[in-house]
């Protein structure tokens, strides 16, 4: 008989406003993490033992995820085959209600697959609404973008963003008091660009001069709040408060005490968009093997 224990890679999204972040927190806290709710929902599937999710990418309080990932081991009672991927998603989403957390899909992976360690890259998108203050922002955009009063000089932003590309010491974009100060500040930024975007249901209402922009960043990993600091600095360039040359100088000076701390974008405009893996690692179980397990449920 096949083992009833299985490792799954789960794809999930969440509206991060009401959570302390994605990582679990002590249950005595008034505000919990997304992981707390995932594990409570999984325990309702009546597994053998305690469920533990291993999150691919950490997000802070107020930050959202279009798609985050985690791996989880689920063992069922003796004689019961592992959940099919479809049933796992359906059951988890049922038990997650009414939380704004949803499983998108699940994939059976090999027992040595690790959602965080095996990730090749992570992509974040930061949404900016230029042309209005936050009180003037359409209600549907509430905690989903950063509203700034004036327009942006996109040409200057593009010039500055190119300086961030490649491998650099990003000490200037980390907190001087960071708990992770022991981690290497050397990061390789594979993508840093800005593109026009649209708001929610914008074709149904007059947006005056409101313009939405997506700031997109991709790297294997980032420093704590690095994306929000890069976004804040680039917006400052677009507003004329910083120059592209100053961005280059900050990188070269490698000083975490520089005044970039005054240009940290708020959390509510940030989304984890995607996590990339080697596709061959996501094929731990063949279609034939999966069919064998599925047949036990019929």
UniProtKB/Swiss-Prot annotation:
Gene3D superfamilies: Pseudouridine synthase I, catalytic domain, C-terminal subdomain (3.30.70.660), Pseudouridine synthase I, catalytic domain, N-terminal subdomain (3.30.70.580). It is an enzyme of class 5 (isomerase). Pfam families: PseudoU_synth_1. Keywords: Isomerase, tRNA processing. It catalyses: a uridine in tRNA = a pseudouridine in tRNA. One of its GO terms (biological process) is tRNA pseudouridine synthesis. Signal peptide: none annotated. Substrate binds at residue 124. It comes from the Eukaryota. One of its GO terms (molecular function) is pseudouridine synthase activity. The active site is at 60 (nucleophile). Belongs to the tRNA pseudouridine synthase TruA family. HAMAP family: TruA. This is tRNA pseudouridine synthase-like 1. It comes from Xenopus laevis. The gene is pusl1.
């Amino acid at each position: 008989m096949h083992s009833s224990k299985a490792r799954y890679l789960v794809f999930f999204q969440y509206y991060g406003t009401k959570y302390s972040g994605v990582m679990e927190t002590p249950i005595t806290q008034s505000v919990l993490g997304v992981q707390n709710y995932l594990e409570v929902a999984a325990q309702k599937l009546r597994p053998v033992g305690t469920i533990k999710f291993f999150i691919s990418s950490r997000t802070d309080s107020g930050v959202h995820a279009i798609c985050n990932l985690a791996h989880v081991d689920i063992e069922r009672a003796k004689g019961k085959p592992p959940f099919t991927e479809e049933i796992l998603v359906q059951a988890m989403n049922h038990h997650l209600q009414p939380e704004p957390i949803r499983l998108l899909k699940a994939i059976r992976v090999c027992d040595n697959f690790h959602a965080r360690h095996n990730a090749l890259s992570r992509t974040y998108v930061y949404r900016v609404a230029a042309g209005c203050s936050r009180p003037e922002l359409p209600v549907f955009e509430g905690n989903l973008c950063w509203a700034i009063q004036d327009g942006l000089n996109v040409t200057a932003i593009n010039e500055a963003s190119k300086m961030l590309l490649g491998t650099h010491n990003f000490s200037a974009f980390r907190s001087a008091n960071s708990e992770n100060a022991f981690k290497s500040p050397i990061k390789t930024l594979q993508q840093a660009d800005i593109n026009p975007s649209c708001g929610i249901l914008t074709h149904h209402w007059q947006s005056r001069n409101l313009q939405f922009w997506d700031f997109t960043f991709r790297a294997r990993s980032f420093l704590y709040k690095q994306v929000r600091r890069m976004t804040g600095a680039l917006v400052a360039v677009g507003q004329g408060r910083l120059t592209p040359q100053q961005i280059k100088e900050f990188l070269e000076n490698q000083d975490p005490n520089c005044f970039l701390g005054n240009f940290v974008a708020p959390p509510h405009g940030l989304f984890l968009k995607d996590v990339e893996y080697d596709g061959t690692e996501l094929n731990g179980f063949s279609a034939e093997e999966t069919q064998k397990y599925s047949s036990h449920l019929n």
